[in-house]
Regions:
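Classic N-terminal secretory signal peptides
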Residues: 1-21
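Cleaved targeting-peptide boundary
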Residues: 20-30
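Short, non-transmembrane alpha-helical segments in secretory-pathway proteins
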Residues: 28-52
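Surface-exposed patches in mature extracellular/periplasmic domains of secreted proteins
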Residues: 53-58, 91
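Short beta-strand segments that buttress and anchor functional surface loops
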Residues: 55, 66-69
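Conserved histidines in hydrophobic membrane contexts and catalytic metal-binding motifs
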Residues: 64-67, 79-80
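Glycine-centered tight beta-turn/hairpin loop motif at sheet-sheet or coil-to-beta transitions
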Residues: 71-73
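A short, surface-exposed beta-strand/turn
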Residues: 76-90
Length: 91
């Protein structure tokens, strides 16, 4: 994922996050054997400027959920598609 795409996705996800959570965000229906390893997702987030990346956990909607600090120093909760690391929502 290119940084420009990530920035656009972060902006869109910020706007969509409350709606997504209210609607019961479903990130994937793919088998867990196809999911990225949490360590790979953590590395990807760090490469895109996030710091203080916390433990990566799966939620009921099959999203990876992680708390991290963004490039501006704000603490965020990120909802990621575990199959490819795409940002699905952010609070």
């Amino acid at each position: 994922m290119h940084i420009r795409r990530l920035i656009i996705l972060v902006g869109l996800a910020t706007l969509a996050a409350p709606l997504a959570r209210a609607a019961g965000l479903q990130c994937t229906t793919a088998d867990k054997s196809t999911w990225l390893a949490p360590a790979a997702v953590q590395k990807m987030l760090q490469e895109h400027g996030f710091s203080n990346v916390g433990a990566i956990k799966a939620d009921a909607g099959n999203c990876y959920v992680v708390q991290a600090t963004d490039q501006t120093g704000a603490k965020k909760t990120l909802y990621l598609d575990p199959t490819d690391g795409d940002l699905m929502g952010m609070e």
